[in-house]
């Protein structure tokens, strides 16, 4: 545990982190990735280039410093971090490397006059405390997944047993275990980690599981991203019969078990976790409103599947919105952006509902504002980021 002096010193750096946190974390990542290339597979280089990863870490460091006296207030943030770490197989030996580079970055960016030996020592102990919290929580999850029926620890070999084009941009991949043994069940909304080798370089990625674990298989549905190393490798190089290493499913973007009306709102490839959520929710009696937004019909994946479910299950209402009418695809329920009036028209009359939404950041920010304006309680509007988490406000 930190003493009062350490906590006071860490909190005194909050103003500096508010103004210069992103510069600090950008410098930190350059130092970490150049000094310890073995950790490069754990980080998406596109998120480094865009600044998303440094911004997310800067926010995390700031929140930790602000709440150093009340760490229980960081429960939601810590849960997201732990699940991301587990899916990528972050291990105890990685933490000293991060700590070393973080403390050096604090000294170099803030300057020796501000980041004195006393400040660095306090931050060193604060980082050590955080590392122990994360290591302990992650080990507990690793052990639980290893001991669970069908579970495993580390990488497990799977085979691609099917590859299906779902739209002009999205392709589904079905994976079955190479050893033929059972696989770990998962909660709808979770994702799975994978190890890829692209151009001789290892990279790791997380992809949402887009269907429940039927037939002892996992399914992911991947959008081809311009310049995306992992997505283009999967689309162009991964074929039926190929082997791939997967890490056990993880994630805390999952359905709350109650009988409130359920609203699933997605934009683009954000549809993927909502498909598994929809499949799971249809096993209950709760009303479901499924709202999906796409650029046009050619890139709208899984329309026929959702339409088929809606025809069989009166509890399910589905609404589609296209940014443009391509003149070829079946018509949507509207054309344009998802605005306040349209969203309120498609929501259940009972606003004591559970909403889950996922898509591009701007889309999610708009949906969050609109749900609040429509009277949906903040705590019942839940969202997930495919990449590093950041604020939507």
Tell me what each language-model feature is.
Residues 189, 270, 360:
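Short, conserved phosphate/pyrophosphate- and ester-handling motifs at nucleotide-, phospho-/glycolipid
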Residues 1-154, 327:
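Globin-like tetrapyrrole-binding proteins
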Residues 248-259:
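A short, basic/flexible loop-to-alpha-helix module at the beginning of a structural domain
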């Amino acid at each position: 545990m930190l003493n009062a002096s350490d906590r006071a010193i860490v909190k005194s750096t909050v103003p500096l982190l508010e103004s210069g946190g992103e510069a600090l974390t950008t410098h930190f990542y350059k130092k970490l990735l150049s000094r310890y290339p073995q950790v490069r597979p754990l980080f998406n280089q596109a998120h480094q280039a865009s600044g998303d990863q440094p911004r997310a870490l800067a926010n995390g460091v700031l929140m930790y410093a602000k709440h150093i006296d009340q760490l229980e207030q960081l429960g939601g943030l810590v849960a997201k971090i732990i699940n991301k770490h587990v899916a990528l197989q972050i291990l105890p030996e990685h933490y000293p490397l991060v700590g070393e580079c973080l403390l050096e970055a604090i000294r170099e960016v803030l300057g020796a006059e501000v980041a004195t030996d006393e400040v660095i020592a306090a931050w060193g102990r604060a980082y050590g405390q955080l590392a122990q919290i994360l290591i302990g929580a992650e080990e507990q999850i690793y052990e639980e997944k290893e001991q669970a029926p069908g579970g495993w620890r580390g990488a497990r070999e799977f085979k691609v047993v099917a590859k299906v084009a779902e739209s002009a941009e999205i392709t589904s991949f079905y994976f079955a275990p190479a050893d033929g043994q059972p696989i770990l069940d998962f909660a709808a909304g979770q994702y799975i980690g994978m190890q890829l080798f692209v151009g001789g370089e290892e990279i790791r990625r997380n992809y949402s599981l887009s269907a429940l674990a039927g037939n002892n298989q996992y399914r992911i549905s991947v959008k081809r991203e311009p310049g995306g190393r992992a997505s283009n490798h999967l689309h162009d190089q991964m074929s039926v019969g190929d082997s791939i290493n997967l890490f056990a499913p993880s994630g805390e973007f999952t359905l709350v078990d109650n009988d409130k009306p359920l609203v699933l709102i997605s934009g683009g490839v954000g549809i993927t976790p909502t498909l598994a959520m929809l499949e799971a929710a249809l096993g209950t009696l709760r009303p479901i409103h499924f709202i999906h937004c796409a650029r046009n019909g050619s890139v709208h994946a899984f329309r026929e599947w959702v339409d088929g479910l809606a025809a069989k299950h009166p509890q399910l209402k589905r609404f589609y919105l296209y940014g443009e009418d391509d003149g070829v695809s079946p018509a949507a329920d509207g054309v344009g952006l998802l605005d306040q009036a349209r969203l309120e028209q498609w929501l259940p009359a009972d606003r004591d509902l559970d909403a889950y939404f996922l898509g591009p950041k701007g889309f999610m920010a708009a949906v969050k504002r609109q749900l609040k304006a429509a009277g949906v309680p903040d705590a019942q509007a839940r969202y997930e980021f495919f990449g590093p988490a950041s604020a939507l406000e």
